[in-house]
Amino acid sequence: MSKLFSTVNSARHSVPLGGMRDYVHIKKLEMNTVLGPDSWNQLMPQKCLLSLDMGTDFSKSAATDDLKYSLNYAVISRDLTNFVSKKKNWGSVSNLAKSVSQFVMDKYSGVECLNLEVQADTTHIRSDHISCIIQQERGNPESQEFDVVRISELKMLTLIGVFTFERLKKQYVTLDIKLPWPKKAELPPPVQSIIDNVVKFVEESNFKTVEALVESVSAVIAHNEYFQKFPDSPLVVKVLKLNAITATEGVGVSCIREPREIAMVNIPYLSSIHESSDIKFQLSSSQNTPIEGKNTWKRAFLAFGSNIGDRFKHIQMALQLLSREKTVKLRNISSIFESEPMYFKDQTPFMNGCVEVETLLTPSELLKLCKKIEYEELQRVKHFDNGPRTIDLDIVMFLNSAGEDIIVNEPDLNIPHPRMLERTFVLEPLCELISPVHLHPVTAEPIVDHLKQLYDKQHDEDTLWKLVPLPYRSGVEPRFLKFKTATKLDEFTGETNRITVSPTYIMAIFNATPDSFSDGGEHFADIESQLNDIIKLCKDALYLHESVIIDVGGCSTRPNSIQASEEEEIRRSIPLIKAIRESTELPQDKVILSIDTYRSNVAKEAIKVGVDIINDISGGLFDSNMFAVIAENPEICYILSHTRGDISTMNRLAHYENFALGDSIQQEFVHNTDIQQLDDLKDKTVLIRNVGQEIGERYIKAIDNGVKRWQILIDPGLGFAKTWKQNLQIIRHIPILKNYSFTMNSNNSQVYVNLRNMPVLLGPSRKKFIGHITKDVDAKQRDFATGAVVASCIGFGSDMVRVHDVKNCSKSIKLADAIYKGLE
């Protein structure tokens, strides 16, 4: 401890590393790069300064006056500039410093030891600069236990002092904090959250002595979850009072403490900070935005949750009761998520979501309506706070007719909800409904950034399951398709990404047709023969998977095919679906039935005989009544696919240079970042953004017709209005599609469309683009290659894959889940 921190405290290079006496220095090499969010929480380039002290032996260079025996600081400076510029976002000063130090030690064998400091001045608005100091010694990785992250000149106002005049007015103090970054720790200390916690603590507390202040700040930092894992890490905290003695720039004290020392110490005011609830905000008592009366339509966002009985039915009933009110209109409903209970853990998992409503009610009147639905209509019994409940309806945000956030601070109602920023099960569904630029009215930060901050903590209880309801079956528990998405650290880039970590669903193709492109006539037989084939198919799939989706088709949808009549399609498919559902030889709790149809009447008949999923290759484009049928059955899953034209014209419509929605699009986002800030992505993503916009347009029509978001999966339509190269590009760009959103003008109002959390189905099986690459003219010869493509689809984020060769592709899926998701 003393070696490292004496180096840091006195001067960066005051203690020679590795016994070296010769050094080459580069002082404050200036460059601009993105270091994660800046002072204004924007991903903009920041100026950073790199200083290097490189221990070497230049005796030979000094004797010969020949540069080749020395470290060329001009070349090193150029190489460092090039190295830093190659990455779009380093994420933090610490990540940049760690990467630069490794780069220097790997590239320049003449560097025997290194002392590196990376400094940035605009990382946090409260601090003059944040820096990271890395020390390395070649051949002796254990020479130092810690690197250091330094927070300099952290400015705050607080009450401090023993004199009466000091107790009446807050005064400025600055803190210098040195955070140890253990060499064995993969991640650096969480600088942003530590600063926020320290600032909140100091500014909401008061002290008589600087000694109490510095000790308490050390305790606040020590109680951070990060340092609980490293109890022997030395924390250095220095405080200066800037106005105590006017003839000085400041007076104060400093201390070095280890978390284990502070754990048993009772620090005053520490109860005001608690890591589990992070930073709570106090709502202003003043209200600058007027609350309009009953004659004006306003907007509100309500969070709903249930964990008693039939949770989904309770949620449906609550939404129906809201919609029956003349003063309330349901505008948009989020996906449904399952979450582990917070606070009181010993209870059933919750089912959660958010709904956006238009209302003539005031906030207090809307609260009364919510309580009426909870306690009178659905008979909620509240035994204690945060306990089980049949239904919970909370007002999360309230906006006036101009779209301005309303702040309410009353004994029985706080808006925005004071604990919403602690809960992914509120923020995740809410962020499906609001634009990434929507600011929290109190913190003035984008709400989506608060969600990211929760996920970055990597707490298991913040991980959610997306649920897609399936119809109720007699004797079977309520059924759902389940998709688990988690934030994972990329061990190579150091960045966090949202990826699906639940098993991929296998959808087995069963074409009861004489003319499908690869298996026409194969299952075009009597019901008994078809059922035997289904039983074998299920056995093959369930050997490795918990469930299987059987996708029955009664009409070929291959491009340019002659379409069977509606009556013929019904004759081929409906009796078969009925037989499958009634079969006692099939494990009905593991068999999910789908019908591949674009006709609403066929879908309606299939629902009557037990189908769970409507797989519509047209996305409602071929039959205007399809959405009405889906809306009438809110427990039916609907796969909304992308195509253009019709069966006979789609192959001529694979040109995507111009955006179909044109000027109606106002703003586009990828991973919640405005596309205008992503110059390197704009030209490369024209195809997938076109597909995303056209899926979004059909999504809007579905929602306008009463379809619920929780019903919808999306399929970008491989092979439909796509060239072979475009099919490959779509597979590669699935991560963009799953994180694509946009705002657009629709019916004289602004609509936000968000594809986040939409499970994606891909159907590459035996398709022509595979044969184009493998030279397999016969579609049936493409099964082996299909297995490889299926694995790639999963690697790029597909949640469900549609295949012909169930037995072998089920193995490909299982392997891909193990490789890309770490599942066994």
From Swiss-Prot:
One Pfam entry name: FolB
Renumbered residue ranges of the record's region HPPK: 295-466
GO BP of this protein: folic acid biosynthetic process; tetrahydrofolate biosynthetic process
Modified residues (Phosphoserine): 286
Transmembrane as UniProt keyword: no
Listed pathway(s): Cofactor biosynthesis; tetrahydrofolate biosynthesis; 2-amino-4-hydroxy-6-hydroxymethyl-7,8-dihydropteridine diphosphate from 7,8-dihydroneopterin triphosphate: step 3/4; Cofactor biosynthesis; tetrahydrofolate biosynthesis; 2-amino-4-hydroxy-6-hydroxymethyl-7,8-dihydropteridine diphosphate from 7,8-dihydroneopterin triphosphate: step 4/4; Cofactor biosynthesis; tetrahydrofolate biosynthesis; 7,8-dihydrofolate from 2-amino-4-hydroxy-6-hydroxymethyl-7,8-dihydropteridine diphosphate and 4-aminobenzoate: step 1/2
UniProt region (DHNA 1), positions on chain: 22-144
GO cellular component, one term: mitochondrion
E.C. no: 4.1.2.25, 2.7.6.3, 2.5.1.15
Record's keyword terms, sorted: Acetylation, ATP-binding, Folate biosynthesis, Kinase, Lyase, Magnesium, Membrane, Metal-binding, Mitochondrion, Multifunctional enzyme, Nucleotide-binding, Phosphoprotein, Transferase
Coiled-coil ranges from the UniProt annotation: none
Top-level taxonomic group: Eukaryota
Record's subcellular location: Mitochondrion membrane
Start and end residues of each Pterin-binding domain: 504-814
Region of interest: DHNA 2: 147-284
GO molecular function: 2-amino-4-hydroxy-6-hydroxymethyldihydropteridine diphosphokinase activity; ATP binding; dihydroneopterin aldolase activity; dihydropteroate synthase activity; kinase activity; metal ion binding
Modification N-acetylserine occurs at: 2
Positions of the UniProt region annotated as DHPS: 506-824
Residues the record lists as binding Mg(2+): 511
Catalyzed reaction equations: 7,8-dihydroneopterin = 6-hydroxymethyl-7,8-dihydropterin + glycolaldehyde; 6-hydroxymethyl-7,8-dihydropterin + ATP = (7,8-dihydropterin-6-yl)methyl diphosphate + AMP + H(+); (7,8-dihydropterin-6-yl)methyl diphosphate + 4-aminobenzoate = 7,8-dihydropteroate + diphosphate
Note: Present with 4589 molecules/cell in log phase SD medium.
Record's function text: Catalyzes three sequential steps of tetrahydrofolate biosynthesis.
Protein family membership: In the N-terminal section; belongs to the DHNA family.
Oligomer status and interactors: Homodimer. Interacts with NAP1.
The name this protein goes by in its record: Folic acid synthesis protein FOL1
Organism: Saccharomyces cerevisiae (strain ATCC 204508 / S288c)
Lineage of producing organism: Eukaryota, Fungi, Dikarya, Ascomycota, Saccharomycotina
Gene (name only): FOL1
